[in-house]
Amino acid sequence: MAAVALGALSQGAAAADAAGRTLFTTRCGMCHQTNGMGVSILSRRPGDGSKGLLEQRDNLSAEFVYAVARVGTGNMPRIPRGEVSDEELRQIALYLSRGNP
């Protein structure tokens, strides 16, 4: 019985990640690109292999991602509800908080 429940949970998490990945690609990808790093300061440094700012982070909770997206910070503008719904942003935030992309 526990194996069945675990399998259903794994399928649910996989479906949530797929939905989050699709939303991230369509709603955030124009700036962050499919690897999630986006602009040069956030991405891996060419040539020396050092990590970019986002790759160094291991504490991006879903709540933090959601708040930053709604309010904006630094060079990242806020994302209004008319562009990305609360539910879509929640799915994106959960996807990113799981270490994706």
Locations of regions flagged by a protein language model:
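Extracytoplasmic electron-transfer domains, predominantly the class I c-type cytochrome c fold
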Residues: P46-N100
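Sec-dependent N-terminal signal peptides
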Residues: M1-A3
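Periplasmic/extracellular electron-transfer cofactor-ligation site
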Residues: R21-S50, A67, R98-P101
